[in-house]
């Protein structure tokens, strides 16, 4: 079974690493890691679920048209990617050149391809 999501769903999925050890695979596509205090939370806590595979994908131009904390979305995402890579056994981390709402089908296709390879389907 895999659990994950896009945007806030991706944030929620990654948050679950810190509260449950039930999922063998968690994914986040364009996770909203800019959410206030999320990076600090990840730094201050260790995942409960260290044995699951984690798939992370964010865009390098997410938040580019904003002037608030969303403008730094790629920076927050990079911090979370690095933290999760250090804290979890198996983490795939990728950044693409797109904005938050761009090329969603391509992003889900990339995840599907990775999942097929991971689970040898």
Task: List the model feature ranges, each with a label.
Residues 12-16, 37:
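Hydrolases whose catalytic domains are alpha/beta-hydrolase-1, hotdog thioesterase
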Residues 55-60, 74-121:
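C-terminal catalytic histidine-bearing segment of alpha/beta-hydrolase fold enzymes
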Residues 1-2, 25-27:
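Residue in the alpha/beta-hydrolase core beta-strand immediately N-terminal to the catalytic nucleophile
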């Amino acid at each position: 079974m895999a659990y994950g999501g896009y945007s806030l769903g991706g944030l929620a999925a990654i948050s679950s690493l810190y509260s449950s050890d039930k999922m063998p695979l968690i994914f986040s596509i364009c996770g909203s890691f800019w959410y206030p205090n999320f990076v600090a939370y990840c730094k201050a806590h260790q995942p409960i679920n260290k044995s699951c595979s984690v798939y992370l994908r964010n865009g390098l131009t997410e938040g580019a048209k904003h002037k608030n904390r969303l403008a730094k979305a790629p920076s927050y995402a990079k911090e979370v990617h690095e933290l999760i890579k250090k804290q979890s056994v198996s983490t795939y981390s990728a950044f693409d050149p797109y904005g938050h709402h761009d090329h969603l089908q391509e992003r889900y296709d990339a995840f599907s391809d990775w999942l097929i390879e991971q689970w040898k389907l």
